[in-house]
From Swiss-Prot:
A carbohydrate binds at S139, E178, N184, F185, R186, N194, D195, Q202. Signal peptide: none annotated. Ca(2+) binds at E172, N174, E178, N194, D195. It comes from Homo sapiens. One of its GO terms (molecular function) is carbohydrate binding. This is C-type lectin domain family 4 member C. Its main location: membrane. The chain crosses the membrane at residues 22-44. Keywords: Adaptive immunity, Calcium, Cell membrane, Disulfide bond, Glycoprotein, Immunity, Innate immunity, Lectin, Membrane, Metal-binding, Signal-anchor, Transmembrane, Transmembrane helix. GO terms for cellular component: external side of plasma membrane; ficolin-1-rich granule membrane; plasma membrane; secretory granule membrane; tertiary granule membrane.
């Protein structure tokens, strides 16, 4: 026969059971609080880190360009593409059209100081965009030259020269001594490329990659 528990023993057992339940509840609440804190801190730290990187990148470009014009890329508001003000943008690049006239070498140096190169034209679509911003009574240096005068044309950024993607005027290039390329307007053919002496001052077009922050 099992001896009957004393009331005092039952109360002590009930108290101990309640203590364990409350202890488990407190521990659970603490764990949930920690999880919530971590889930809040991680995105905050991520955003802070990304902001610091953006500011660092902006400071890097400020040595060339004190002002940037930025637009949101796609649906993610955290991704922005920027071009220096007042450069124009097309696809993944930014373009600057000079108003002053210099030799080809000085024009390339001027672009380089701004973190760019004389323009390299890769597609018909790119050329069509560029000519919308040009004046018909002016000529503009391209980043295309023939240093050896042997018709071995090369782009300043080492992009391979592809004769299938060129837009020379009819009959051009036509002079081995004219070792630099310009884009200009001819009433009979509209816009196209022409070879010219590199020392003859012309306007120019600079091109650089968009700045992503």
């Amino acid at each position: 026969m099992v001896p009957e528990e004393e009331p005092q023993d039952r109360e002590k057992g009930l108290w101990w059971f309640q203590l364990k339940v409350w202890s488990m509840a407190v521990v659970s609440i603490l764990l949930l609080s920690v999880c919530f804190t971590v889930s809040s801190v991680v995105p905050h730290n991520f955003m802070y880190s990304k902001t610091v990187k953006r500011l660092s990148k902006l400071r890097e470009y400020q040595q060339y360009h004190p002002s940037l014009t930025c637009v949101m890329e796609g649906k993610d508001i955290e991704d922005w593409s920027c071009c220096p003000t007042p450069w124009t943008s097309f696809q993944s690049s930014c373009y600057f059209i000079s108003t002053g006239m210099q030799s080809w070498t000085k024009s390339q140096k001027n672009c380089s100081v701004m973190g760019a190169d004389l323009v390299v034209i890769n597609t018909r679509e790119e050329q069509d965009f560029i000519i919308q911003n040009l004046k018909r009574n002016s000529s503009y240096f391209l980043g295309l030259s023939d240093p050896g005068g042997r018709r071995h044309w090369q782009w300043v950024d080492q992009t391979p020269y592809n004769e299938n993607v060129t837009f020379w005027h009819s009959g051009e290039p036509n002079n081995l001594d004219e070792r630099c390329a310009i884009i200009n307007f001819r009433s009979s053919e509209e816009w196209g490329w022409n070879d010219i002496h590199c020392h003859v001052p012309q306007k120019s077009i600079c091109k650089m990659k968009k700045i992503y922050i």
